[in-house]
């Protein structure tokens, strides 16, 4: 069994924010793979289904980003899951738009959602880092991630969410490198430049 966590802030006010791309991805996984309707649970919303023959629970914490770890800890404890069985989808300003990287453990790069999860669960969970770009000035990062994606960005956002959802079963079986490569090739084929030469790891 796996717990897939999408990070974001609850409510229509934040729906289109860059910070909410994690929510967008798990919504697309649920839609594409015919998961159960979303229901309130574990200080958030959950949807359940099967990917690659394995049971997967999707979780969208409703605690707001800074307290995401409370919901993740509650769900992981209920299902008796360790850190390695948790996959977190989150926005990553240190990656250019439309890029994606998978990482296990490591630093949190100032991401408050990851900080909260690491504090409540431990640090060795897997992260699917979804590039939203850096505004160029540290002082306006907060504004950048809490702004909606620009109209011109929406095509790659939709393509990235669809592509990640399409290949998500590779994450279930721990084939992170294969997953990353498949997403990279698919995004390239769709016309979005995702060459492996940008962003900090």
Swiss-Prot record:
Q: What are the residue positions of the site described as Stabilizes the basic form of H active site to accept a proton? A: 91
**Keyword field:** Cytoplasm, Hydrolase, RNA-binding, tRNA-binding
Q: Where is this site: Discriminates between blocked and unblocked aminoacyl-tRNA?
A: 9
Q: Name one GO biological process term.
A: protein quality control for misfolded or incompletely synthesized proteins
Localization annotation: Cytoplasm
This protein's GO CC annotations? cytoplasm
Main location per the UniProt record: cytoplasm
Q: Which domain of life is it from?
A: Bacteria
State whether keyword rRNA processing applies: no
Q: Which reaction does it catalyse?
A: an N-acyl-L-alpha-aminoacyl-tRNA + H2O = an N-acyl-L-amino acid + a tRNA + H(+)
Mind listing the GO molecular function terms for this protein? peptidyl-tRNA hydrolase activity; tRNA binding
PROSITE patterns tied to this protein: PEPT_TRNA_HYDROL_1 (PS01195), PEPT_TRNA_HYDROL_2 (PS01196)
Q: Which Pfam families match?
A: Pept_tRNA_hydro
What EC number(s) does this enzyme carry? 3.1.1.29
Q: Where is the active site?
A: 19
List, alphabetically, the InterPro entries matched. Answer: Pept_tRNA_hydro, Pept_tRNA_hydro_CS, Pept_tRNA_hydro_sf
The record describes its quaternary structure and partners as: Monomer.
Q: What does this protein do?
A: Hydrolyzes ribosome-free peptidyl-tRNAs (with 1 or more amino acids incorporated), which drop off the ribosome during protein synthesis, or as a result of ribosome stalling.
Family the UniProt entry places it in: Belongs to the PTH family.
Q: What protein is this chain from?
A: Peptidyl-tRNA hydrolase
Species of origin reads Afipia carboxidovorans (strain ATCC 49405 / DSM 1227 / KCTC 32145 / OM5) (Oligotropha carboxidovorans)
Query: Which gene codes for it?
Result: pth
């Amino acid at each position: 069994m796996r717990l897939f966590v999408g990070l974001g802030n609850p409510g229509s006010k934040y729906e289109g924010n860059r910070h909410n791309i994690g929510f967008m991805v798990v919504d697309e996984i649920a839609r594409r793979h015919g998961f159960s309707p979303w229901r309130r649970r574990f200080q958030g919303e959950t949807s359940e289904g099967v990917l690659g023959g394995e049971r997967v629970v999707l979780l969208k914490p409703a605690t707001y980003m800074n307290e995401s770890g409370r919901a993740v800890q509650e769900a992981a404890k209920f299902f008796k899951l360790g850190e390695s069985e948790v996959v977190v989808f989150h926005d990553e300003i240190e990656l250019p738009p439309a890029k994606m990287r998978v990482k296990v453990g490591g630093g949190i790069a100032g991401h408050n959602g990851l900080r909260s999860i690491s504090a409540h669960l431990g640090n060795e969970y897997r992260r699917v880092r979804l590039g939203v770009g850096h505004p160029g000035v540290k002082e306006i990062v907060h504004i950048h991630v809490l702004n909606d994606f620009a109209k011109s960005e929406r095509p790659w956002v939709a393509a990235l969410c669809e592509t990640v959802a399409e290949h998500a079963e590779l994450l279930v079986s721990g084939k992170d490198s294969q997953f990353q490569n498949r997403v990279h090739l698919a995004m390239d084929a769709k016309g979005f430049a995702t060459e492996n030469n940008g962003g900090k790891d």
